[in-house]
Amino acid sequence: MSRIERIFAREILDSRGTPTVEVEVWTEFGGYGCAKAPSGASTGVNEALELRDGDKARYNGKGVLKAVKNVNEIIAPKLIGVDALDQLTVDRIMLDLDGTEFKTKLGANGILAVSLAVAKSAASELDIPLYKYLGGVQAKKLPVPMLNVINGGEHADSAIDFQEFMIMPVGAKSFSEALRWSSETFQALKSLLKSKKDITAVGDEGGFAPNFEWAYEKHDLKSFKAKTPAEIALDLLVEAIKKAGYKPGKDGIMIAMDCASSELYLEDKKYHFKKIEKVTNQEWSLTTDEMISYLEKLVDNYPIISIEDGLAETDWEGFTKLTQKIGDKVQIVGDDLFTTNPKFIKQGINKKAANSTLIKLNQIGTLSETVEAITMTQKAGWTAVVSHRSGETEDTTIADLAVAFNTGQIKTGSMSRSDRIAKYNRLLQIESELDKNAVYDGLEAFYNLKK
């Protein structure tokens, strides 16, 4: 038994310059852990509450001093003396202190930072890496990275309504090789954008945010050369993959998308592509069935292996239809649909509404609940994709978590911005530590699909 001796929280800044919570934990025998809470821009309605101060005179209302105070004055006194190695008890005490379904009293940002810092302090005291502390001898699988190289939607001021276009090096033989392929493809994409005199500025997650002015003529919807911005982005990725010297497809690099469709879904139950409308001055909206057909068309025409939030979080019936249509050949990932909540994941499993769950720690708010979400997902034969948020820090916990539970996939941004690269560098360290025991599944990570 190793008792928690001290807990201290403070307000720090994330990758967007927005306040977040950092927590440090010390144990009686010298263990130390530090964790920082991430923050999302595109959020699901059922996510645990990210507690903000609301004082417009300070950080435009986004300060987190309330959450910090809750940790230091309410949570810390109750956890002092508790065994740091007993994660379930630590998390249960905090859940009981909060007493609400979505952690609206104390704030998930503070609770999560404490939960992760305690786990890190326990690993530190045992003098083992976090992934080994959580996963034991079975923790050896390096995840296939899902790298966001073109940003749209809420993550960038670009011409694209869909939020993320990602590359997945499924044909690589190791994680380090996969990362090299990804870096080279990212640089090839930058070169292509420069050649078209497009923008090479990056969005929140380090991907490019192009305007595609070279691809259309003004005031004409059909001027995207008969293609939508999503198709133009996909064409660019295929070209960049080839330019980098790799094959688009199962033997090389495949493509993943996060549509973040809840952001497009309005009260008329249609998906409105506002960025297309802004460019063309013409309305473009799709019904659920039309959206499914559109996504099916993209899958037929491009080497796409994963689609996240292809429909709105309230469109459960649509998700079931989408999964029936293309779920045998494409990973259908629920993010806003499930919000890493076992209650909603179970509902999704029963409805066959997806075949994969995105795992975002701050959506649920404790390590124990996150592990429950991963376990439930994997037992159903679905994949679990561990994910960052658009607002990040140098914290690398999710890298260890992905390896600890052999999730096989991780989504943590592009090949730029140190807050994203930190996670990849941590995975390189883990691969080096595991040495010959390290496993990289590549395409086999998609065990939920028919090969």
From Swiss-Prot:
EC number, as in UniProt: 4.2.1.11
One MF annotation (Gene Ontology) recorded for this entry: magnesium ion binding
Positions annotated to bind Mg(2+): D258, E308, D335
GO biological process terms, semicolon-separated: glycolytic process
Transmembrane annotation, as ranges: none
Principal subcellular localization: cytoplasm
Comment on bound cofactor: Binds a second Mg(2+) ion via substrate during catalysis.
Cofactor: Mg(2+)
Catalytic residue positions: E205 (proton donor), K360 (proton acceptor)
Pathway: Carbohydrate degradation; glycolysis; pyruvate from D-glyceraldehyde 3-phosphate: step 4/5
Gene Ontology, cellular component aspect: cell surface; extracellular region; phosphopyruvate hydratase complex
Catalysis performed (reactions): (2R)-2-phosphoglycerate = phosphoenolpyruvate + H2O
Keyword Nucleotidyltransferase: no
Residues holding (2R)-2-phosphoglycerate: Q163, K360, R389, S390, K411
Subcellular location: Cytoplasm; Secreted; Cell surface
Enzyme superclass (EC): lyase
Family classification: Belongs to the enolase family.
Protein name: Enolase
Name of the gene this protein is made from: eno
